[in-house]
């Protein structure tokens, strides 16, 4: 496994600990809420939650913001634009767009683990326009065509 060093900046509203892997084989690191006051996410509503950190990713890397399964299954709280993408050239505060799909209001307290961040390498492509594409068994079938 390759370890890549990434610069991280604690902002004024930062509190708690830096994102870290919970276990040796964890893919994601928990992001911590850095709100000064509790934030209520009403049922069916969306809120932008600060984390108090900014990062400088190397070229060809992105950060993906994903839901925490416990918040989703227990409270219906998930990341609205999952996965959210943080590009390598973004230097602002990482914020998480949470949506409450539950039936009750949910309160985000300072220091709460609200999402996971996964750092991933990506490839850039160059389009090659073509009048035809190689045939496959699946063809153009989609949206449940391989099974329900």
Swiss-Prot record:
Annotated EC: 3.6.1.23
InterPro entries noted in UniProt: dUTPase, dUTPase-like, dUTPase-like_sf, dUTPase_trimeric
Protein's pathway: Pyrimidine metabolism; dUMP biosynthesis; dUMP from dCTP (dUTP route): step 2/2
Signal peptide: none
One GO term of the biological process aspect: dUMP biosynthetic process
Residue sites binding substrate per the record: 68-70, 81, 85-87, 95
Main EC class the enzyme belongs to: hydrolase
Superkingdom, taxonomy of origin: Bacteria
A Pfam family assignment: dUTPase
Keywords: Hydrolase, Magnesium, Metal-binding, Nucleotide metabolism
One annotated GO molecular function: dUTP diphosphatase activity
Reaction catalysed by this enzyme: dUTP + H2O = dUMP + diphosphate + H(+)
Cofactor(s) this protein requires: Mg(2+)
Keyword Iron attributed: no
Family, as annotated: Belongs to the dUTPase family.
Functional note: This enzyme is involved in nucleotide metabolism: it produces dUMP, the immediate precursor of thymidine nucleotides and it decreases the intracellular concentration of dUTP so that uracil cannot be incorporated into DNA.
NCBIfam families referenced in this protein's UniProt entry, alphabetically: dut, PRK00601.1
The protein, known as: Deoxyuridine 5'-triphosphate nucleotidohydrolase
């Amino acid at each position: 496994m390759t370890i890549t060093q990434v610069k991280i900046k604690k902002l004024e509203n930062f509190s708690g600990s830096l994102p870290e892997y919970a276990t040796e084989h964890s893919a994601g690191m928990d992001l911590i809420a850095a709100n000064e006051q509790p934030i209520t996410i009403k049922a069916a509503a969306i809120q932008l939650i600060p984390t108090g950190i900014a990062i400088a990713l190397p070229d060809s890397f992105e950060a993906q913001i994903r839901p925490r399964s416990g918040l989703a299954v227990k409270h219906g709280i998930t990341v609205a634009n999952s996965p959210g993408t943080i590009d390598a050239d973004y230097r602002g505060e990482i914020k998480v767009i949470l949506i409450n799909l539950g039936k009750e209001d949910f309160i985000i307290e300072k220091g709460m683990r609200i999402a996971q961040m996964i750092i991933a390498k990506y490839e850039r492509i160059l389009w090659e326009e073509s009048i035809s594409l190689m045939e496959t068994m699946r063809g153009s079938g989609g949206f449940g065509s391989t099974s329900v």
